[in-house]
Curated annotation (Swiss-Prot):
The lineage of its organism: Bacteria, Pseudomonadati, Thermodesulfobacteriota, Desulfovibrionia, Desulfovibrionales. It comes from Nitratidesulfovibrio vulgaris (strain DSM 19637 / Miyazaki F). One of its GO terms (biological process) is protoporphyrinogen IX biosynthetic process. Its EC number is 2.5.1.61. This is Porphobilinogen deaminase. Pathway: Porphyrin-containing compound metabolism; protoporphyrin-IX biosynthesis; coproporphyrinogen-III from 5-aminolevulinate: step 2/4. It is an enzyme of class 2 (transferase). It comes from the Bacteria. The gene is hemC. NCBIfam families: hemC (TIGR00212). One of its GO terms (molecular function) is hydroxymethylbilane synthase activity. Tetrapolymerization of the monopyrrole PBG into the hydroxymethylbilane pre-uroporphyrinogen in several discrete steps.
C-alpha cells in the first residue's frame, strides 16, 4: 500500500478541502492510503489584526510549503486565492481541480439583500476587495474588519455584532452552511478574488509520480481561468489582501474573457476592463493575457490607486 501525506491548515474549510482530495485519491487509486498533516500558519495564529495590516505574502501557505520541501508531506491542498504569485523554488501547482462557484455571498439575520440594508448598516468582511466594491455600491455602509473561522464569523452575525457579513460562496457550499437570509454577490456587479472557489494541489517539481497519480483531477478550463486571473494579479504586484478583483470565464474551446478591477479603499475610484484571449491547456498564454490586462489598467490609473493602498507615493508600473 502506497502512503501519501497531505499538508493542510486546521480550519474546518481547509480540512474539508484536504479530506475531499484524500477521498478522490483513495477512490481513484484503491492501493493508495492518504493521511493528513495539520499545520498552523501565520495567518491562522494572528487573528486580532486585519489581514491587510499583517503584512507579507503567503500568510496561509508558508509553513505548509516548508513541509513539502523538507519531506514531511507529499502534497498540499490550498485555496487558490491564498497562494502567492511566486512559488518557492522546487514547488509547482501541479494540479488544479474543477472550480466551485467563485462568487461571494451576502449573509444576514434580518435583511434580504445588500440593497435592503438600512442606511449606515455595519457589514463585516476580511477583504479589502469586498470593502471597496461594497462601498462603491453603498457608500453609506460602515464596513469593518471581520476575522476568524467560518463558525466564528457566523456566530458574530447571529449575536448582532453585524447587520450583515460577506463570505465566499464556495466555502459556504462546501461546509453546508447558511444564514437566515442571503444573496449571491457575483459578476458582473461584484467581482471575486483571483482564484476564488478554486483549489490548487502543490507538490515538489521532481515528483513526476504525483503528477501522474493525480492527473485525473486536473480540470483544464479551471486552470486556464485561474492562470489568467493570477497573471492579472501578478502584473499589479498584488497579493490576496489588496482591492484587486479578477474573473475569467470560458467562452469557447480554449478561449476566455478576463475582467479585472482595481479600486481605492473607499470605492470612489474603480477601474475595470475586460480582455479576451485564447490559451493552451497549461494556461501559459492565459497568464500573459492577465499581465496584458494589468498593464492596461495601470495605464488607466490603477498604479496610482495601488500606490496609495500600499502606503507609498510610488505608483505600480
Amino acid at each position: 500500500m502506497k502512503k501519501l501525506v497531505i499538508a493542510t491548515r486546521g480550519s474546518k474549510l481547509a480540512l474539508w478541502q484536504a479530506e475531499h482530495v484524500k477521498s478522490c485519491i483513495e477512490g481513484q487509486h484503491p492501493g493508495v492510503s492518504v493521511e493528513l498533516l495539520v499545520l498552523k500558519t501565520r495567518g491562522d495564529i494572528i487573528l486580532d489584526v486585519p489581514l491587510a495590516k499583517v503584512g507579507g505574502k503567503g500568510l496561509f501557505v508558508k509553513e505548509i510549503e516548508e513541509a513539502l520541501l523538507d519531506g514531511r508531506a507529499d502534497l498540499a491542498v490550498h485555496s487558490m486565492k491564498d497562494v502567492p504569485m511566486e512559488l518557492p523554488e522546487g514547488l509547482v501547482l501541479g494540479i488544479i481541480p474543477e472550480r466551485e462557484e467563485p462568487s461571494d455571498t451576502f449573509l444576514s439575520v434580518h435583511h434580504d439583500s445588500l440593497a435592503a440594508l438600512p442606511h449606515g448598516a455595519t457589514v463585516g468582511t476580511s477583504s479589502l476587495r469586498r470593502q471597496s466594491q461594497l462601498l462603491a455600491l453603498r457608500p453609506d455602509l460602515n464596513v469593518v474588519s471581520l476575522r476568524g473561522n467560518v463558525d466564528t464569523r457566523l456566530r458574530k452575525l447571529s449575536e448582532g455584532q453585524f447587520d450583515a457579513i460577506i463570505m465566499a460562496t464556495a466555502g459556504m457550499k462546501r461546509l453546508g452552511l447558511s444564514a437566515p437570509r442571503s444573496e449571491v454577490l457575483g459578476p458582473p456587479a461584484f467581482l471575486p478574488a483571483v482564484g476564488q472557489g478554486a483549489l490548487g494541489i502543490e507538490f515538489r517539481a521532481d515528483r513526476a509520480d504525483l503528477h501522474e497519480l493525480l492527473a485525473f483531477m486536473e480540470h483544464t478550463p479551471t486552470r486556464i481561468r485561474v492562470e489568467a486571473e493570477r497573471g492579472f494579479l501578478a502584473g499589479l504586484q498584488g497579493g490576496c489582501q489588496v482591492p484587486i478583483a479578477g474573473h475569467a470565464v470560458m467562452t469557447g474551446d480554449g478561449t476566455f474573457a478576463l475582467e479585472g478591477l482595481v479600486a481605492d479603499l473607499t470605492g470612489a475610484r474603480v477601474i475595470r476592463r475586460t480582455m479576451n484571449g485564447v490559451s493552451a491547456p497549461d494556461g501559459a498564454q492565459a497568464r500573459q493575457i492577465g499581465l496584458d490586462l494589468a498593464a492596461q489598467l495601470v495605464a488607466d490609473g490603477a498604479g496610482e490607486i495601488l500606490a496609495e493602498v500600499y502606503g507609498s507615493g510610488e505608483a505600480v508600473n
